[in-house]
């Protein structure tokens, strides 16, 4: 039996950066380390971190458990409000936000300050999007067709960005629909899907063409590997 493994399989650069730096922080043993939520969507890696003493802070816990601790901001990033809350307890904040997510945060912050409405195409409950939305005053998330009906019927200028792990076809579809809704409005479109995501999406299509079946090995909580709604 022939097994065809994709050349882009494995951790992307953002995940590698977060994982390597978390292990590096743990090796210093300067203080107890907590990750604000799950560092990445990979249970094996999370188990390895737990085995060396790195703890995961969950939202249902009292934030006082972070007092005097080192707190790691996971690859998905967080909102400014969340960072402020963590900083009021932690001794040290280590920001391991993926550089592509940080780019979106910067765009949203910039254009929001210039008076633009921000339209984010992505999953509203995904940690990345929750964090990104925290950088805007006037922000809407489009994930399903019915979300388009929630957009205001006005002519306010807008910025459109995408979740880094979004399917390109979904981005193109919603951009076209938003443009159709706001024909006389200034709209700035930024395709912020990361290169690694597009590479994997394109590669799996090519692999499917030359094989009888395709298996995707992934964590069940990684919503971007599921079919788009």
Regions found by a protein language model. Name each.
Residues 1-229:
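The feature marks the mature, well-folded catalytic cores of soluble enzymes
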């Amino acid at each position: 039996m022939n097994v065809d493994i994709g050349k882009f399989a494995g951790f992307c650069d953002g995940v590698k950066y977060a994982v390597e730096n978390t292990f590096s922080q743990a090796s210093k043993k300067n203080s107890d380390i907590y990750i604000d939520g799950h560092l990445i969507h990979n249970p094996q890696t999370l188990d390895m971190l737990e085995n060396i003493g790195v703890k995961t802070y969950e939202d249902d816990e009292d934030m006082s458990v972070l007092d005097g601790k080192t707190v790691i901001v996971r690859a998905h990033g967080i909102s400014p409000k969340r960072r402020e809350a963590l900083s009021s307890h932690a001794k040290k904040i280590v920001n391991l936000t993926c550089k592509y997510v940080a780019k979106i945060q910067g765009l949203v912050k910039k254009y929001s300050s210039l008076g633009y409405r921000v339209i984010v195409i992505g999953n509203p409950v995904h940690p990345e999007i929750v964090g990104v939305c925290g950088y805007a005053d006037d922000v809407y998330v489009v994930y399903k067709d019915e979300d388009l009906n929630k957009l205001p019927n006005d002519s306010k200028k807008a910025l459109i960005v995408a979740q880094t792990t979004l399917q390109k076809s979904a981005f193109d579809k919603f951009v076209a629909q938003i443009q159709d809704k706001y024909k006389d409005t200034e709209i700035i479109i930024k395709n912020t899907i990361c290169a690694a995501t597009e590479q994997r999406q394109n590669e799996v299509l090519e692999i499917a063409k030359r094989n009888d079946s395709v298996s995707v090995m992934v964590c069940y909580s990684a919503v971007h590997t599921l079919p788009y709604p």
